């Protein structure tokens, strides 16, 4: 059984609160979905805004390998000739191979929203579908609010489908627009629908009851051959069916022909691309494509996974382009530590006392407030230290930081930093002294310190110019202590090729930030040296 995937991220997904895709964003997403193997891409509603019109103009010259672009619109307006309906005429100008039309299935909407008669609504559906069949290879009919309409007035809801089928619709998509229908209802209603229409059926599920993916799978079980959804489940209110779950479930769990199986490995990257372009943080525990979808923390779990991953993983993470993560925390056992050390490329025997020493140190540090989830660079530096493999690239000699606020001016911070590097590093670069004492300003004390220490070290390690602080999180650990509370700072950094996290803990937020900053730069230098060594060996 072959299932067609219809992506509506660029229209329904863009209706999510706070999401607005630029034209360039839309084109990047379209290219990524085509590469993934998606069959249809709904580009937007040409009659609703200039940005969607620009998108359809832009894609006219693009040659997609897999997907067909669809333009979306409503049926003609009540009591208006189809040739005179502005929305329909704008839709035709999009010149897409597929037109998707939504019409009313629920008598409540016909009478209250459209404010027309039930008979006129049927004419609107027929006129629009039959007219558009003259201009496109394919017309998809979206039956808006179909399941609610069916429950309210079964006979009328079915009539709307029959009319669309008679007009020539290539697929009838049943929409759970309010997201209130449950899987068993989906199955029962589709069973009945199949007795009255012969056209292929599709499903468009919203997630207001948290069952959009389940409803989509239920529809397929009962014969739907067309599934609609969005990447990461983006959409209005609670979102749409998440294609990042729907697709692998159909392929890996139900054994259906959807996209090429080898293309599933691209799913993780597509999910993260859409998250980045939408400006919405990626949900870390999202099934299949979340960063922590295959993360293991408990020592017993890790021990079992080492023997056979099937013990705690429902699929191989690599099938969807993801990876297994072994977390380090106070819950970690020997298995976690061993696995992480091996991931870093260090050889260590299982019986080595160093393993238990590292585990003991982790538990001591976590008791002080350290947390190594999300700070794997700090964990690696700790391991290097305890294995005698931590190189000293620089020595911190001191810093001063102050915040200045004048009466009529914005406040700013100034930091001075003094560092020392090994003599041989200074000599190799032609510097007379291995010291650097410098200052920098920033909007706040942490930014000032960050700029100052980079300025000092870039003189000796030019590659640090590529490093940027990309995220900064602060957590107060013992709030009852008030202003004396211990602070944990988590910093995320990137050099354009890698991302890594470091952590610092102190009652002084500046000191905690300083620790995390220094470890971030030290980790970068370790990785640069490793990369250089690997290049020389190859």
UniProtKB/Swiss-Prot annotation:
Catalyzes the condensation of pyruvate and acetyl-coenzyme A to form (R)-citramalate. CDD domains: DRE_TIM_LeuA3. Residues 3-268 form the Pyruvate carboxyltransferase domain. Keywords: Amino-acid biosynthesis, Branched-chain amino acid biosynthesis, Isoleucine biosynthesis, Transferase. It catalyses: pyruvate + acetyl-CoA + H2O = (3R)-citramalate + CoA + H(+). It comes from the Bacteria. This is (R)-citramalate synthase. One of its GO terms (molecular function) is (R)-citramalate synthase activity. GO terms for biological process: isoleucine biosynthetic process; L-leucine biosynthetic process. It holds the Pfam family LeuA_dimer. Belongs to the alpha-IPM synthase/homocitrate synthase family. SMART domains: LeuA_dimer (SM00917). It is an enzyme of class 2 (transferase). InterPro entries: 2-isopropylmalate_synth_dimer (IPR013709), AIPM/Hcit_synth_CS (IPR002034), Aldolase_TIM (IPR013785), Citramal_synthase (IPR005675), LeuA/HCS_post-cat (IPR054691), LeuA_allosteric_dom_sf (IPR036230), PYR_CT (IPR000891). Its EC number is 2.3.3.21. Pathway: Amino-acid biosynthesis; L-isoleucine biosynthesis; 2-oxobutanoate from pyruvate: step 1/3.
